[in-house]
């Protein structure tokens, strides 16, 4: 075991800088590549040939015309008419004005996109390019998040950024009109603030409890709450992040961890618990105050307890296929197969209104690539179990990876919850978790660049491929 560990331990210390000497240059090239690719998507994609794009556009047009915030009404969703538009390629003689079924969405994105609408006099491309800009800012924030946690591991920072920048479906959605772009940006800004606060907590000095430091911490937590509230005012999945962020703050203040693995966690005390509750309230209070007006408005418009307008939305979209009806007609096994297959494909790329697929062999290659990444994560897990120096990480980085793991679980849980009602096996609904997902992708790929792990993974992949093909390669 010692001989195996020693075979890769020396190179692991300089692995990142061996392969990537100028990470900022790589980041610049990634940004340029993303902007070019996303702009081409925005220009070439025919009008309205993105999921729900007309309904999002109509929300912006409604605000730009001076009518105030959109309101969801009966008749704003007509499944037959929508099917006719999609199947006909949105012919010019059929109006999109009646597609207003996204009016229940939180309004911040539509308000932010209104100047782009005015600047282009309602031109679709101008608003699409606004989303391309949001995507570029999001990439910078994602890189900053990764660099905050792994400042000496550019393979992780650059790798995660590159994965998100060139994920085909994500590029397509970043070049379309929707509220996902601003929601991702605000989510990443929230995470960057949280990760920097966590880092300061883990590497705190003895004088951490001074009044000056406490004042700085309160301002940081207040900013965290404001960003979280803005995220909740942009996309409903911001609500899923609220308990996660507040829980991390509470747990960190309560346990008072240090970065060094050889330092024990402090024994939780009642005083620490009171401080932890206070810190969590500094986050939740501004977030809730920012969203309170939206709740009151929704209660007035849509009825008691419909804080988010979801009940009104569910009543209107009666024509959408429901999960219960699908299972009753096709069977549960078929439903699971469809869930896994279509979610996988649409995560990587199913374009238009989810009807334009890539070549089948591309999905096969992506499936093989995903399998290789799983092996890379397995190698990383073995390294973490071995502990330092093989792990090459401190407690702060381990905690962040744990947080990322919980975030991935939350993303898939919200995806499963939404699919309990309607059949919505769209991989793009996982994109609000691209920070942790891309971090694990980069971690797996970095592990595979270790000589021993790479050779063993290649051997396993070849044997698996031979078994799948039913024959051994000829000598």
What are these regions (language model features)?
Residues 22-54, 61-90, 97, 282-300, ...:
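Transmembrane signal-anchor helices characteristic of membrane glycosylation enzymes that use polyprenol
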Residues 30, 226-227, 245-246, 265-295, ...:
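Hydrophobic alpha-helical membrane-interfacial segments at the cytosolic entry of transmembrane helices
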Residues 61-127, 313-329, 336-337, 341, ...:
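Interfacial juxtamembrane loops and adjacent helix segments
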Residues 125, 142-166, 184-185, 203-206, ...:
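Transmembrane-helix signature of polytopic, membrane-embedded enzymes
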Residues 126-151, 189, 379:
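Transmembrane-helix motifs of polytopic, lipid-linked glycan transferases
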Residues 193-207, 214, 241-285, 295:
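Perimembrane helix-loop-helix junctions
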Residues 220-236, 286:
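Membrane-interface alpha helices of multi-pass inner-membrane proteins
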Residues 299-387:
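Membrane-lumen/periplasm interface segments of multi-pass, membrane-embedded glycan/lipid transferases
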């Amino acid at each position: 075991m010692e001989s195996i560990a020693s075979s890769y331990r020396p190179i692991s210390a300089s692995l990142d800088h061996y392969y990537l000497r100028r990470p900022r240059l790589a980041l610049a090239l990634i940004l340029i590549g993303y902007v070019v690719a996303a702009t081409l998507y925005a220009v070439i994609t025919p009008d309205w040939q993105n999921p729900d794009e007309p309904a999002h556009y109509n929300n912006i047009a409604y605000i730009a015309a001076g009518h105030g915030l959109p309101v969801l009404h009966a008749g704003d969703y007509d499944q037959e008419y929508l099917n006719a538009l999609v199947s006909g390629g949105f012919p010019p003689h059929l109006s999109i004005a009646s597609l207003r079924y996204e009016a229940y969405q939180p309004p911040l994105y539509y308000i932010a996109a209104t100047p782009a609408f005015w600047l282009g006099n309602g031109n679709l491309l101008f608003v699409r390019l606004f989303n391309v800009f949001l995507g570029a800012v999001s990439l910078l924030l994602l890189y900053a998040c990764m660099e905050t946690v792994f400042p000496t591991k550019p393979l992780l920072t650059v790798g995660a950024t590159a994965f998100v920048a060139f994920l085909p479906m994500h590029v397509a959605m970043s070049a379309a009109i929707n509220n996902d772009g601003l929601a991702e940006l605000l989510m990443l800004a929230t995470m960057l603030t949280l990760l920097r606060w966590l880092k300061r907590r883990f590497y705190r000095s003895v004088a951490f409890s001074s009044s000056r430091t406490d004042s700085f911490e309160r301002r940081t937590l207040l900013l965290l709450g404001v960003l979280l509230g803005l995220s909740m005012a942009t996309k409903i999945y911001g609500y899923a992040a609220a308990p996660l962020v507040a829980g991390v703050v509470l747990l960190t203040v309560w346990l008072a961890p240090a970065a060094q693995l050889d330092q024990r966690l402090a024994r939780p005390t009642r005083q620490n618990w009171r401080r932890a509750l206070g810190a969590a309230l500094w986050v939740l209070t501004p977030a809730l105050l920012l969203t309170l007006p939206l709740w009151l408005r929704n209660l007035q418009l849509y009825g008691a307890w419909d804080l988010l307008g979801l009940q009104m939305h569910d009543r209107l979209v009666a024509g959408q296929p429901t999960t219960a009806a699908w299972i009753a007609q096709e069977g549960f096994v078929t439903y699971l197969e469809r869930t896994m297959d279509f979610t996988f494909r649409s995560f990587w790329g199913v374009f238009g209104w989810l009807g334009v697929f890539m070549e089948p062999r591309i999905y096969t290659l992506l499936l093989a690539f995903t399998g290789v990444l799983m092996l890379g994560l397995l190698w990383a897990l073995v390294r973490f179990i071995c502990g330092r120096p093989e792990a090459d990480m401190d407690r702060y980085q381990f905690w962040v990876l744990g947080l990322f793991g919980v975030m991935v679980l939350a993303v898939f849980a919200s995806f499963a919850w939404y699919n309990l009602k309607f059949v919505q096996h769209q991989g793009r609904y996982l994109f609000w978790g691209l920070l942790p997902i891309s971090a694990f992708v980069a971690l797996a790929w970095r592990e595979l660049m270790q000589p021993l792990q790479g050779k063993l993974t290649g051997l396993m992949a070849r044997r698996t491929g031979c078994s799948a093909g039913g024959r051994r390669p000829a000598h």
